[in-house]
UniProtKB/Swiss-Prot annotation:
This enzyme's EC code(s): 1.13.11.51
UniProt entry tagged with the keyword Membrane: no
Cofactor(s), by name: Fe(2+)
Biotechnology: Interfering with NCED1 expression in fruits increases shelf life and reduces seed number, but increases viscosity of juices and modifies fruit texture.
Lineage: Eukaryota, Viridiplantae, Streptophyta, Embryophyta, Tracheophyta
Official protein name in the record: 9-cis-epoxycarotenoid dioxygenase NCED1, chloroplastic
Biological source species: Solanum lycopersicum
Length: 605
Protein backbone atom coordinates (compact mmCIF):
# COMPACT_ATOMS: atom_id res chain seq x y z
CA UNK A 1 0.00 0.00 0.00
CA UNK A 2 1.37 3.37 -0.95
CA UNK A 3 1.86 5.82 1.87
CA UNK A 4 -0.74 8.55 1.88
CA UNK A 5 0.18 12.15 2.49
CA UNK A 6 -3.33 13.41 3.11
CA UNK A 7 -5.40 12.53 6.12
CA UNK A 8 -8.99 11.75 6.96
CA UNK A 9 -11.41 13.33 9.34
CA UNK A 10 -14.78 12.11 10.48
CA UNK A 11 -17.37 14.75 11.20
CA UNK A 12 -20.51 12.63 11.24
CA UNK A 13 -20.77 12.57 15.01
CA UNK A 14 -21.09 15.40 17.50
CA UNK A 15 -18.21 15.97 19.86
CA UNK A 16 -19.86 16.04 23.28
CA UNK A 17 -21.97 12.98 24.03
CA UNK A 18 -23.28 11.67 27.32
CA UNK A 19 -22.33 8.27 28.67
CA UNK A 20 -24.54 5.28 29.46
CA UNK A 21 -24.43 4.05 33.02
CA UNK A 22 -22.07 1.23 33.91
CA UNK A 23 -24.97 -1.08 34.66
CA UNK A 24 -26.60 -0.38 31.34
CA UNK A 25 -23.58 -0.15 29.08
CA UNK A 26 -24.90 -1.48 25.87
CA UNK A 27 -28.57 -0.67 26.48
CA UNK A 28 -30.20 1.61 23.96
CA UNK A 29 -29.41 5.25 24.64
CA UNK A 30 -30.66 8.38 22.94
CA UNK A 31 -27.62 10.37 24.05
CA UNK A 32 -25.69 9.86 20.84
CA UNK A 33 -26.54 12.14 17.94
CA UNK A 34 -25.70 10.70 14.56
CA UNK A 35 -25.68 13.29 11.84
CA UNK A 36 -26.98 10.95 9.16
CA UNK A 37 -28.53 7.54 8.63
CA UNK A 38 -30.99 7.94 11.49
CA UNK A 39 -33.05 4.78 11.83
CA UNK A 40 -35.82 3.57 14.08
CA UNK A 41 -34.23 0.39 15.41
CA UNK A 42 -36.77 -2.06 16.74
CA UNK A 43 -35.59 -5.71 16.96
CA UNK A 44 -32.88 -7.98 15.66
CA UNK A 45 -31.99 -11.06 17.63
CA UNK A 46 -28.20 -10.89 17.25
CA UNK A 47 -25.69 -12.41 19.61
CA UNK A 48 -22.53 -10.34 19.65
CA UNK A 49 -19.00 -11.64 19.99
CA UNK A 50 -15.55 -10.26 20.51
CA UNK A 51 -14.04 -11.77 17.38
CA UNK A 52 -15.47 -12.96 14.15
CA UNK A 53 -13.32 -14.77 11.62
CA UNK A 54 -9.85 -13.21 11.60
CA UNK A 55 -9.14 -15.01 8.36
CA UNK A 56 -11.71 -14.96 5.60
CA UNK A 57 -11.07 -17.41 2.78
CA UNK A 58 -12.29 -15.77 -0.38
CA UNK A 59 -12.57 -17.01 -3.95
CA UNK A 60 -10.03 -15.72 -6.44
CA UNK A 61 -9.99 -11.96 -6.87
CA UNK A 62 -11.05 -10.39 -10.13
CA UNK A 63 -8.18 -8.72 -11.96
CA UNK A 64 -10.41 -5.74 -12.80
CA UNK A 65 -10.03 -4.06 -9.42
CA UNK A 66 -8.52 -0.58 -9.68
CA UNK A 67 -6.62 0.59 -6.61
CA UNK A 68 -8.12 3.94 -5.54
CA UNK A 69 -5.71 6.84 -5.87
CA UNK A 70 -7.71 9.55 -4.16
CA UNK A 71 -7.41 8.89 -0.42
CA UNK A 72 -8.37 12.36 0.78
CA UNK A 73 -11.53 12.75 2.82
CA UNK A 74 -12.83 15.66 4.81
CA UNK A 75 -16.46 14.63 5.26
CA UNK A 76 -18.26 11.43 4.30
CA UNK A 77 -20.98 13.31 2.40
CA UNK A 78 -18.40 15.11 0.29
CA UNK A 79 -16.48 11.88 -0.18
CA UNK A 80 -19.54 10.25 -1.67
CA UNK A 81 -19.49 12.89 -4.42
CA UNK A 82 -15.77 13.25 -4.98
CA UNK A 83 -13.35 10.37 -4.47
CA UNK A 84 -16.24 7.94 -4.74
CA UNK A 85 -16.90 9.06 -8.30
CA UNK A 86 -13.15 9.02 -8.99
CA UNK A 87 -12.95 5.39 -7.96
CA UNK A 88 -16.13 4.19 -9.65
CA UNK A 89 -15.31 5.97 -12.91
CA UNK A 90 -12.73 3.24 -13.56
CA UNK A 91 -15.37 0.51 -13.43
CA UNK A 92 -16.66 -1.06 -16.64
CA UNK A 93 -20.36 -1.44 -17.42
CA UNK A 94 -20.59 -4.90 -15.85
CA UNK A 95 -18.96 -3.65 -12.65
CA UNK A 96 -21.25 -0.63 -12.47
CA UNK A 97 -24.33 -2.80 -12.94
CA UNK A 98 -23.08 -5.26 -10.33
CA UNK A 99 -22.36 -2.44 -7.89
CA UNK A 100 -25.88 -1.03 -8.27
CA UNK A 101 -27.47 -4.44 -7.76
CA UNK A 102 -25.33 -5.33 -4.74
CA UNK A 103 -25.91 -1.91 -3.18
CA UNK A 104 -29.65 -2.43 -3.53
CA UNK A 105 -29.41 -5.82 -1.85
CA UNK A 106 -27.36 -4.33 0.98
CA UNK A 107 -29.85 -1.49 1.47
CA UNK A 108 -32.70 -3.97 1.71
CA UNK A 109 -30.73 -6.11 4.17
CA UNK A 110 -29.90 -3.12 6.35
CA UNK A 111 -33.51 -1.93 6.30
CA UNK A 112 -34.65 -5.37 7.42
CA UNK A 113 -32.08 -5.46 10.23
CA UNK A 114 -33.05 -2.04 11.52
CA UNK A 115 -36.72 -2.99 11.76
CA UNK A 116 -35.67 -4.85 14.90
CA UNK A 117 -33.83 -3.59 17.99
CA UNK A 118 -30.11 -4.20 17.98
CA UNK A 119 -28.65 -5.87 21.08
CA UNK A 120 -26.69 -3.56 23.32
CA UNK A 121 -23.46 -5.27 22.25
CA UNK A 122 -24.08 -4.25 18.63
CA UNK A 123 -25.95 -0.96 18.96
CA UNK A 124 -23.76 1.96 17.83
CA UNK A 125 -25.89 4.40 19.83
CA UNK A 126 -24.42 2.66 22.86
CA UNK A 127 -21.10 1.19 21.78
CA UNK A 128 -19.70 4.52 20.62
CA UNK A 129 -21.46 6.93 22.96
CA UNK A 130 -19.82 9.41 25.30
CA UNK A 131 -16.04 9.26 25.28
CA UNK A 132 -16.16 5.97 23.41
CA UNK A 133 -17.20 8.06 20.40
CA UNK A 134 -14.72 8.65 17.56
CA UNK A 135 -12.71 11.80 16.93
CA UNK A 136 -11.17 13.38 13.82
CA UNK A 137 -7.45 13.22 13.18
CA UNK A 138 -5.42 15.88 14.95
CA UNK A 139 -2.21 17.23 13.37
CA UNK A 140 0.77 17.81 15.61
CA UNK A 141 0.31 20.40 18.35
CA UNK A 142 3.61 21.49 19.93
CA UNK A 143 4.51 22.95 23.34
CA UNK A 144 1.45 21.72 25.19
CA UNK A 145 0.59 23.17 28.63
CA UNK A 146 2.15 21.12 31.43
CA UNK A 147 1.25 21.18 35.10
CA UNK A 148 4.09 19.95 37.30
CA UNK A 149 7.38 18.75 35.86
CA UNK A 150 7.93 16.04 33.28
CA UNK A 151 10.55 13.58 34.64
CA UNK A 152 13.91 13.72 32.85
CA UNK A 153 13.74 10.04 31.92
CA UNK A 154 10.54 10.58 29.93
CA UNK A 155 12.20 11.19 26.56
CA UNK A 156 10.55 9.68 23.51
CA UNK A 157 6.95 9.04 22.52
CA UNK A 158 3.99 7.41 24.24
CA UNK A 159 1.65 5.82 21.69
CA UNK A 160 -1.72 4.21 22.31
CA UNK A 161 -4.03 2.38 19.92
CA UNK A 162 -7.81 2.45 19.80
CA UNK A 163 -10.96 1.89 17.74
CA UNK A 164 -12.24 4.97 15.91
CA UNK A 165 -14.77 4.41 13.08
CA UNK A 166 -14.27 6.80 10.18
CA UNK A 167 -17.83 6.42 8.93
CA UNK A 168 -21.14 6.38 10.72
CA UNK A 169 -22.29 2.77 11.19
CA UNK A 170 -25.25 1.88 9.00
CA UNK A 171 -26.22 -1.22 11.00
CA UNK A 172 -24.68 -3.23 13.84
CA UNK A 173 -21.44 -1.96 15.36
CA UNK A 174 -19.35 -3.03 18.34
CA UNK A 175 -16.75 -0.74 19.87
CA UNK A 176 -14.02 -3.16 18.77
CA UNK A 177 -15.10 -2.82 15.11
CA UNK A 178 -13.73 0.70 14.70
CA UNK A 179 -10.85 1.69 12.45
CA UNK A 180 -7.47 1.86 14.14
CA UNK A 181 -6.28 5.24 15.38
CA UNK A 182 -2.97 5.86 17.16
CA UNK A 183 -2.61 8.71 19.67
CA UNK A 184 0.93 9.96 20.30
CA UNK A 185 2.48 12.26 22.89
CA UNK A 186 6.13 13.04 22.18
CA UNK A 187 8.48 14.34 24.87
CA UNK A 188 11.56 16.41 24.05
CA UNK A 189 13.58 18.27 26.67
CA UNK A 190 10.68 18.75 29.05
CA UNK A 191 8.21 19.78 26.35
CA UNK A 192 5.33 17.73 24.92
CA UNK A 193 3.46 17.50 21.61
CA UNK A 194 0.36 15.55 20.58
CA UNK A 195 -1.03 14.05 17.38
CA UNK A 196 -3.52 11.36 16.41
CA UNK A 197 -3.87 9.65 13.05
CA UNK A 198 -5.78 6.78 11.50
CA UNK A 199 -3.69 3.75 10.63
CA UNK A 200 -4.15 3.65 6.88
CA UNK A 201 -5.12 0.01 6.50
CA UNK A 202 -6.03 -1.44 3.12
CA UNK A 203 -9.59 -1.57 4.39
CA UNK A 204 -9.63 2.11 5.35
CA UNK A 205 -8.04 3.25 2.08
CA UNK A 206 -10.69 1.48 0.01
CA UNK A 207 -13.59 2.67 2.14
CA UNK A 208 -12.31 6.25 2.00
CA UNK A 209 -12.15 6.05 -1.78
CA UNK A 210 -15.70 4.70 -1.97
CA UNK A 211 -16.99 7.19 0.59
CA UNK A 212 -18.71 4.62 2.81
CA UNK A 213 -18.11 1.39 4.77
CA UNK A 214 -18.17 -1.75 2.61
CA UNK A 215 -16.09 -4.26 4.59
CA UNK A 216 -18.06 -6.49 7.01
CA UNK A 217 -17.75 -5.62 10.70
CA UNK A 218 -16.49 -8.70 12.48
CA UNK A 219 -18.47 -8.23 15.68
CA UNK A 220 -21.38 -5.94 14.97
CA UNK A 221 -22.54 -7.53 11.70
CA UNK A 222 -21.32 -11.11 11.20
CA UNK A 223 -24.01 -12.98 13.10
CA UNK A 224 -26.73 -15.34 12.00
CA UNK A 225 -28.30 -15.32 8.58
CA UNK A 226 -27.78 -11.60 8.05
CA UNK A 227 -24.09 -12.11 8.75
CA UNK A 228 -23.93 -14.82 6.10
CA UNK A 229 -25.68 -12.49 3.68
CA UNK A 230 -23.15 -9.73 4.37
CA UNK A 231 -20.27 -12.13 3.76
CA UNK A 232 -21.82 -13.19 0.46
CA UNK A 233 -22.21 -9.54 -0.53
CA UNK A 234 -18.57 -8.92 0.24
CA UNK A 235 -17.48 -12.01 -1.71
CA UNK A 236 -19.55 -10.84 -4.67
CA UNK A 237 -18.03 -7.35 -4.60
CA UNK A 238 -14.62 -8.98 -4.63
CA UNK A 239 -15.46 -11.22 -7.57
CA UNK A 240 -16.56 -8.20 -9.61
CA UNK A 241 -13.44 -6.24 -8.65
CA UNK A 242 -15.36 -3.62 -6.67
CA UNK A 243 -13.23 -4.22 -3.57
CA UNK A 244 -9.91 -5.96 -3.07
CA UNK A 245 -9.70 -8.31 -0.11
CA UNK A 246 -6.42 -9.89 -1.18
CA UNK A 247 -4.37 -7.50 0.97
CA UNK A 248 -6.25 -8.03 4.20
CA UNK A 249 -9.41 -6.86 5.91
CA UNK A 250 -8.10 -5.90 9.35
CA UNK A 251 -8.47 -2.69 11.34
CA UNK A 252 -5.13 -2.67 13.27
CA UNK A 253 -6.83 -1.10 16.29
CA UNK A 254 -5.74 -3.17 19.31
CA UNK A 255 -2.04 -3.64 20.12
CA UNK A 256 1.22 -1.79 19.55
CA UNK A 257 4.75 -3.15 19.73
CA UNK A 258 8.10 -1.59 18.83
CA UNK A 259 10.29 -4.30 17.32
CA UNK A 260 13.29 -4.32 14.99
CA UNK A 261 13.15 -0.52 14.61
CA UNK A 262 9.48 -0.48 13.65
CA UNK A 263 6.28 0.49 15.44
CA UNK A 264 3.67 -2.13 14.55
CA UNK A 265 -0.09 -1.62 14.94
CA UNK A 266 -1.99 -4.89 15.27
CA UNK A 267 -5.31 -6.66 15.47
CA UNK A 268 -5.54 -10.43 15.20
CA UNK A 269 -7.57 -10.28 11.98
CA UNK A 270 -4.63 -9.27 9.77
CA UNK A 271 -0.91 -8.72 9.43
CA UNK A 272 0.60 -5.84 11.42
CA UNK A 273 0.86 -2.34 9.98
CA UNK A 274 4.09 -0.35 10.14
CA UNK A 275 3.50 3.15 11.52
CA UNK A 276 6.36 5.65 11.60
CA UNK A 277 6.76 8.49 14.10
CA UNK A 278 8.09 11.55 12.28
CA UNK A 279 10.70 13.89 13.80
CA UNK A 280 7.94 16.41 14.55
CA UNK A 281 5.88 13.83 16.44
CA UNK A 282 3.36 13.10 13.68
CA UNK A 283 2.34 9.60 12.58
CA UNK A 284 2.65 8.14 9.09
CA UNK A 285 1.45 4.72 7.92
CA UNK A 286 4.19 2.98 5.94
CA UNK A 287 2.00 0.01 5.02
CA UNK A 288 1.03 -3.56 5.79
CA UNK A 289 4.10 -5.34 7.17
CA UNK A 290 4.87 -9.00 6.41
CA UNK A 291 8.45 -9.06 7.75
CA UNK A 292 9.94 -8.97 4.26
CA UNK A 293 7.64 -11.67 2.92
CA UNK A 294 8.15 -14.07 5.82
CA UNK A 295 4.74 -13.73 7.50
CA UNK A 296 1.96 -15.39 5.52
CA UNK A 297 -0.73 -15.44 8.20
CA UNK A 298 -2.39 -13.13 10.68
CA UNK A 299 -0.72 -12.37 14.02
CA UNK A 300 -2.46 -11.80 17.34
CA UNK A 301 -2.44 -8.35 18.91
CA UNK A 302 -0.26 -9.32 21.90
CA UNK A 303 3.09 -10.70 20.69
CA UNK A 304 5.68 -10.95 23.45
CA UNK A 305 9.03 -9.18 23.29
CA UNK A 306 11.66 -10.96 25.39
CA UNK A 307 13.61 -8.25 27.26
CA UNK A 308 16.80 -10.34 27.39
CA UNK A 309 17.06 -11.97 23.95
CA UNK A 310 15.25 -9.24 22.00
CA UNK A 311 13.19 -11.90 20.22
CA UNK A 312 9.49 -11.53 19.42
CA UNK A 313 7.14 -14.47 20.08
CA UNK A 314 3.68 -14.69 18.52
CA UNK A 315 0.63 -16.78 17.68
CA UNK A 316 -1.74 -16.91 14.72
CA UNK A 317 -5.17 -18.52 14.61
CA UNK A 318 -7.54 -19.54 11.82
CA UNK A 319 -11.25 -20.10 12.41
CA UNK A 320 -11.93 -21.92 9.13
CA UNK A 321 -9.30 -24.55 8.44
CA UNK A 322 -6.57 -26.47 10.21
CA UNK A 323 -4.11 -25.80 11.62
CA UNK A 324 -6.34 -23.64 13.79
CA UNK A 325 -3.41 -22.37 15.83
CA UNK A 326 0.26 -21.73 15.03
CA UNK A 327 3.21 -20.51 17.09
CA UNK A 328 6.29 -18.77 15.72
CA UNK A 329 9.02 -16.36 16.71
CA UNK A 330 11.29 -13.72 15.22
CA UNK A 331 14.96 -13.23 16.00
CA UNK A 332 15.95 -9.76 17.19
CA UNK A 333 16.92 -9.07 13.56
CA UNK A 334 13.45 -9.96 12.30
CA UNK A 335 14.14 -13.46 10.96
CA UNK A 336 11.08 -15.68 11.32
CA UNK A 337 11.14 -19.29 12.52
CA UNK A 338 9.08 -22.05 10.97
CA UNK A 339 5.51 -22.30 12.18
CA UNK A 340 4.77 -24.79 14.94
CA UNK A 341 1.27 -26.25 14.80
CA UNK A 342 -0.51 -26.24 18.16
CA UNK A 343 -3.07 -29.06 18.11
CA UNK A 344 -6.48 -27.83 19.29
CA UNK A 345 -9.81 -29.53 18.65
CA UNK A 346 -11.72 -26.36 17.80
CA UNK A 347 -10.64 -22.91 16.64
CA UNK A 348 -10.25 -20.99 19.89
CA UNK A 349 -10.42 -17.34 20.87
CA UNK A 350 -6.73 -16.53 21.31
CA UNK A 351 -6.22 -12.88 22.25
CA UNK A 352 -3.17 -13.26 24.50
CA UNK A 353 -0.57 -15.70 25.82
CA UNK A 354 2.56 -15.60 27.97
CA UNK A 355 6.28 -16.37 27.90
CA UNK A 356 8.81 -17.40 30.54
CA UNK A 357 12.58 -17.66 30.23
CA UNK A 358 12.30 -21.05 28.51
CA UNK A 359 8.66 -21.66 27.64
CA UNK A 360 5.59 -20.24 25.96
CA UNK A 361 2.26 -20.61 27.78
CA UNK A 362 -0.72 -20.97 25.44
CA UNK A 363 -4.30 -20.82 26.75
CA UNK A 364 -6.95 -23.05 25.14
CA UNK A 365 -10.11 -21.80 26.80
CA UNK A 366 -13.89 -22.12 26.60
CA UNK A 367 -14.64 -19.40 24.06
CA UNK A 368 -14.47 -21.06 20.64
CA UNK A 369 -15.45 -20.39 17.03
CA UNK A 370 -18.21 -22.49 15.47
CA UNK A 371 -19.09 -21.12 12.06
CA UNK A 372 -22.02 -23.53 11.81
CA UNK A 373 -23.81 -21.48 14.47
CA UNK A 374 -24.31 -18.71 11.90
CA UNK A 375 -26.40 -21.11 9.81
CA UNK A 376 -28.54 -21.71 12.89
CA UNK A 377 -29.01 -17.97 13.27
CA UNK A 378 -26.53 -17.36 16.07
CA UNK A 379 -23.06 -16.02 16.70
CA UNK A 380 -20.00 -17.89 15.42
CA UNK A 381 -18.33 -17.23 18.78
CA UNK A 382 -19.56 -19.65 21.41
CA UNK A 383 -18.99 -20.13 25.13
CA UNK A 384 -18.55 -23.92 25.31
CA UNK A 385 -19.55 -24.88 28.86
CA UNK A 386 -18.62 -28.52 28.25
CA UNK A 387 -15.02 -27.71 27.41
CA UNK A 388 -12.37 -27.71 30.13
CA UNK A 389 -9.93 -24.81 29.88
CA UNK A 390 -6.27 -25.76 29.70
CA UNK A 391 -2.86 -24.20 29.25
CA UNK A 392 -0.25 -25.56 26.87
CA UNK A 393 3.43 -25.37 27.80
CA UNK A 394 5.98 -25.55 25.00
CA UNK A 395 9.70 -24.92 24.76
CA UNK A 396 10.27 -21.50 23.18
CA UNK A 397 12.56 -23.00 20.57
CA UNK A 398 10.53 -26.12 19.79
CA UNK A 399 10.52 -27.12 16.14
CA UNK A 400 7.21 -28.97 16.44
CA UNK A 401 4.45 -29.56 18.95
CA UNK A 402 5.44 -33.08 20.00
CA UNK A 403 6.63 -32.01 23.46
CA UNK A 404 3.67 -29.75 24.18
CA UNK A 405 2.25 -30.37 27.67
CA UNK A 406 -1.35 -29.52 28.51
CA UNK A 407 -2.47 -28.70 32.06
CA UNK A 408 -6.18 -28.33 32.74
CA UNK A 409 -7.41 -25.24 34.60
CA UNK A 410 -11.19 -25.69 34.99
CA UNK A 411 -13.56 -22.74 34.77
CA UNK A 412 -10.85 -20.29 33.80
CA UNK A 413 -11.05 -17.63 31.10
CA UNK A 414 -8.30 -15.03 30.98
CA UNK A 415 -8.72 -12.46 28.24
CA UNK A 416 -5.27 -11.11 29.15
CA UNK A 417 -2.22 -12.67 30.78
CA UNK A 418 0.06 -10.17 32.52
CA UNK A 419 3.14 -12.32 33.10
CA UNK A 420 4.47 -15.82 33.74
CA UNK A 421 7.64 -17.28 35.22
CA UNK A 422 9.25 -20.57 36.21
CA UNK A 423 9.73 -21.82 39.76
CA UNK A 424 12.22 -24.68 39.48
CA UNK A 425 11.99 -25.73 43.13
CA UNK A 426 8.35 -26.80 42.69
CA UNK A 427 8.43 -27.69 38.97
CA UNK A 428 5.76 -25.08 38.40
CA UNK A 429 5.05 -22.31 35.97
CA UNK A 430 3.25 -19.37 37.58
CA UNK A 431 0.83 -17.47 35.35
CA UNK A 432 -0.64 -14.10 36.32
CA UNK A 433 -3.90 -13.17 34.60
CA UNK A 434 -7.33 -11.66 35.09
CA UNK A 435 -9.98 -14.39 35.18
CA UNK A 436 -13.22 -13.12 33.71
CA UNK A 437 -16.73 -14.31 34.50
CA UNK A 438 -18.99 -14.88 32.70
CA UNK A 439 -16.44 -15.81 30.02
CA UNK A 440 -18.58 -14.31 27.26
CA UNK A 441 -19.62 -11.21 29.18
CA UNK A 442 -17.88 -8.86 26.77
CA UNK A 443 -19.09 -10.86 23.77
CA UNK A 444 -22.79 -11.39 24.43
CA UNK A 445 -25.63 -9.84 26.37
CA UNK A 446 -26.00 -11.36 29.83
CA UNK A 447 -27.72 -10.48 33.09
CA UNK A 448 -24.82 -11.46 35.33
CA UNK A 449 -22.39 -8.65 36.12
CA UNK A 450 -18.85 -8.88 34.81
CA UNK A 451 -16.08 -9.83 37.22
CA UNK A 452 -12.39 -9.70 36.36
CA UNK A 453 -10.35 -11.24 39.18
CA UNK A 454 -6.56 -10.92 39.25
CA UNK A 455 -5.41 -14.51 39.72
CA UNK A 456 -2.33 -16.65 40.24
CA UNK A 457 -2.44 -19.89 38.26
CA UNK A 458 0.17 -22.55 39.02
CA UNK A 459 0.86 -25.21 36.39
CA UNK A 460 2.77 -28.21 37.75
CA UNK A 461 4.92 -29.74 35.03
CA UNK A 462 5.56 -32.91 37.04
CA UNK A 463 2.02 -33.78 38.16
CA UNK A 464 0.09 -32.14 35.34
CA UNK A 465 -2.19 -30.50 37.91
CA UNK A 466 -3.06 -26.85 38.45
CA UNK A 467 -4.14 -24.52 41.23
CA UNK A 468 -5.76 -21.11 40.98
CA UNK A 469 -6.31 -18.42 43.57
CA UNK A 470 -7.27 -14.78 43.77
CA UNK A 471 -4.22 -12.62 44.46
CA UNK A 472 -6.36 -10.09 46.34
CA UNK A 473 -7.70 -12.36 49.07
CA UNK A 474 -9.73 -9.79 51.02
CA UNK A 475 -13.22 -9.70 49.42
CA UNK A 476 -13.68 -6.10 50.55
CA UNK A 477 -10.67 -5.03 48.47
CA UNK A 478 -11.65 -7.00 45.37
CA UNK A 479 -11.99 -4.84 42.24
CA UNK A 480 -12.24 -5.52 38.53
CA UNK A 481 -8.71 -5.32 37.13
CA UNK A 482 -8.22 -5.34 33.36
CA UNK A 483 -5.74 -3.77 30.94
CA UNK A 484 -2.25 -3.13 32.24
CA UNK A 485 1.20 -4.61 32.54
CA UNK A 486 4.23 -5.47 34.61
CA UNK A 487 7.66 -3.88 34.21
CA UNK A 488 8.41 -5.05 30.67
CA UNK A 489 12.10 -5.36 31.50
CA UNK A 490 10.98 -8.25 33.73
CA UNK A 491 8.60 -9.93 31.29
CA UNK A 492 8.87 -13.71 31.58
CA UNK A 493 10.66 -13.40 34.91
CA UNK A 494 9.37 -13.32 38.48
CA UNK A 495 7.79 -9.94 39.13
CA UNK A 496 6.53 -8.38 42.34
CA UNK A 497 4.18 -5.76 40.92
CA UNK A 498 1.48 -5.43 38.30
CA UNK A 499 -0.15 -2.15 37.25
CA UNK A 500 -3.74 -2.69 36.16
CA UNK A 501 -6.73 -0.57 35.21
CA UNK A 502 -9.53 -0.38 37.77
CA UNK A 503 -12.43 -1.21 35.46
CA UNK A 504 -15.11 0.34 37.65
CA UNK A 505 -17.73 1.48 37.02
CA UNK A 506 -17.59 -0.97 34.11
CA UNK A 507 -16.78 -0.37 31.29
CA UNK A 508 -15.02 2.85 32.31
CA UNK A 509 -11.68 3.00 34.15
CA UNK A 510 -11.58 5.20 37.25
CA UNK A 511 -7.87 4.72 38.02
CA UNK A 512 -5.19 2.07 38.29
CA UNK A 513 -4.05 -0.36 40.96
CA UNK A 514 -0.50 -1.25 41.89
CA UNK A 515 -0.77 -4.83 43.12
CA UNK A 516 1.90 -6.72 45.05
CA UNK A 517 1.71 -10.15 43.43
CA UNK A 518 3.35 -11.81 46.44
CA UNK A 519 1.28 -10.34 49.28
CA UNK A 520 -1.91 -9.23 47.54
CA UNK A 521 -1.49 -5.68 48.85
CA UNK A 522 -3.28 -3.12 46.67
CA UNK A 523 -2.47 0.56 46.26
CA UNK A 524 -4.84 2.65 44.16
CA UNK A 525 -4.44 5.82 42.17
CA UNK A 526 -7.75 7.43 41.19
CA UNK A 527 -7.68 9.80 38.23
CA UNK A 528 -10.04 12.34 39.83
CA UNK A 529 -13.69 13.35 40.07
CA UNK A 530 -15.52 12.70 36.80
CA UNK A 531 -12.22 11.55 35.26
CA UNK A 532 -11.74 8.20 33.56
CA UNK A 533 -8.90 6.69 31.60
CA UNK A 534 -7.55 3.43 30.26
CA UNK A 535 -4.54 1.15 30.34
CA UNK A 536 -1.71 2.30 32.64
CA UNK A 537 1.71 2.10 30.99
CA UNK A 538 4.75 1.52 33.21
CA UNK A 539 7.92 3.30 32.06
CA UNK A 540 11.11 2.37 33.96
CA UNK A 541 13.19 5.32 35.15
CA UNK A 542 16.40 3.36 34.55
CA UNK A 543 16.47 -0.07 32.87
CA UNK A 544 19.30 -1.06 35.23
CA UNK A 545 17.53 0.00 38.41
CA UNK A 546 17.43 -2.63 41.16
CA UNK A 547 13.96 -1.51 42.25
CA UNK A 548 11.29 -3.08 40.07
CA UNK A 549 8.83 -0.22 40.62
CA UNK A 550 11.35 2.56 39.96
CA UNK A 551 9.55 4.36 37.17
CA UNK A 552 6.41 6.19 36.09
CA UNK A 553 2.87 5.39 35.03
CA UNK A 554 1.50 7.13 31.93
CA UNK A 555 -2.22 7.15 31.15
CA UNK A 556 -4.64 9.13 29.01
CA UNK A 557 -7.43 10.58 31.16
CA UNK A 558 -10.69 12.27 30.13
CA UNK A 559 -12.72 14.68 32.27
CA UNK A 560 -16.36 13.89 31.50
CA UNK A 561 -17.58 17.08 33.18
CA UNK A 562 -15.25 19.55 31.47
CA UNK A 563 -15.00 17.39 28.34
CA UNK A 564 -11.23 17.76 28.18
CA UNK A 565 -8.45 15.19 27.98
CA UNK A 566 -4.96 15.02 29.47
CA UNK A 567 -2.00 12.71 29.96
CA UNK A 568 -1.15 11.99 33.57
CA UNK A 569 2.35 10.98 34.68
CA UNK A 570 2.43 9.27 38.09
CA UNK A 571 5.41 8.17 40.20
CA UNK A 572 5.08 4.38 40.35
CA UNK A 573 6.84 4.10 43.72
CA UNK A 574 4.94 6.78 45.63
CA UNK A 575 1.79 6.96 43.45
CA UNK A 576 2.05 10.75 43.44
CA UNK A 577 1.06 12.76 40.38
CA UNK A 578 4.25 14.22 38.87
CA UNK A 579 2.90 16.00 35.79
CA UNK A 580 -0.20 16.54 33.69
CA UNK A 581 -0.06 17.32 29.98
CA UNK A 582 -3.14 19.18 28.73
CA UNK A 583 -4.19 17.83 25.33
CA UNK A 584 -5.64 19.96 22.50
CA UNK A 585 -8.48 17.56 21.68
CA UNK A 586 -10.49 14.75 23.17
CA UNK A 587 -8.84 11.32 23.46
CA UNK A 588 -11.44 8.51 23.40
CA UNK A 589 -11.12 5.49 25.66
CA UNK A 590 -9.03 2.92 23.83
CA UNK A 591 -6.88 -0.17 24.05
CA UNK A 592 -3.15 -0.83 24.38
CA UNK A 593 -0.01 1.26 24.11
CA UNK A 594 3.77 1.34 24.37
CA UNK A 595 6.62 3.81 24.84
CA UNK A 596 9.45 4.33 22.35
CA UNK A 597 12.52 5.98 23.80
CA UNK A 598 14.32 8.80 22.00
CA UNK A 599 17.24 6.62 20.88
CA UNK A 600 14.93 4.07 19.28
CA UNK A 601 12.96 6.84 17.58
CA UNK A 602 16.12 8.11 15.96
CA UNK A 603 16.86 4.63 14.57
CA UNK A 604 13.47 3.86 13.01
CA UNK A 605 13.48 1.90 9.78
Amino acid sequence: MATTTSHATNTWIKTKLSMPSSKEFGFASNSISLLKNQHNRQSLNINSSLQAPPILHFPKQSSNYQTPKNNTISHPKQENNNSSSSSTSKWNLVQKAAAMALDAVESALTKHELEHPLPKTADPRVQISGNFAPVPENPVCQSLPVTGKIPKCVQGVYVRNGANPLFEPTAGHHFFDGDGMVHAVQFKNGSASYACRFTETERLVQEKALGRPVFPKAIGELHGHSGIARLMLFYARGLFGLVDHSKGTGVANAGLVYFNNRLLAMSEDDLPYHVKVTPTGDLKTEGRFDFDGQLKSTMIAHPKLDPVSGELFALSYDVIQKPYLKYFRFSKNGEKSNDVEIPVEDPTMMHDFAITENFVVIPDQQVVFKMSEMIRGGSPVVYDKNKVSRFGILDKYAKDGSDLKWVEVPDCFCFHLWNAWEEAETDEIVVIGSCMTPPDSIFNECDEGLKSVLSEIRLNLKTGKSTRKSIIENPDEQVNLEAGMVNRNKLGRKTEYAYLAIAEPWPKVSGFAKVNLFTGEVEKFIYGDNKYGGEPLFLPRDPNSKEEDDGYILAFVHDEKEWKSELQIVNAMSLKLEATVKLPSRVPYGFHGTFINANDLANQA
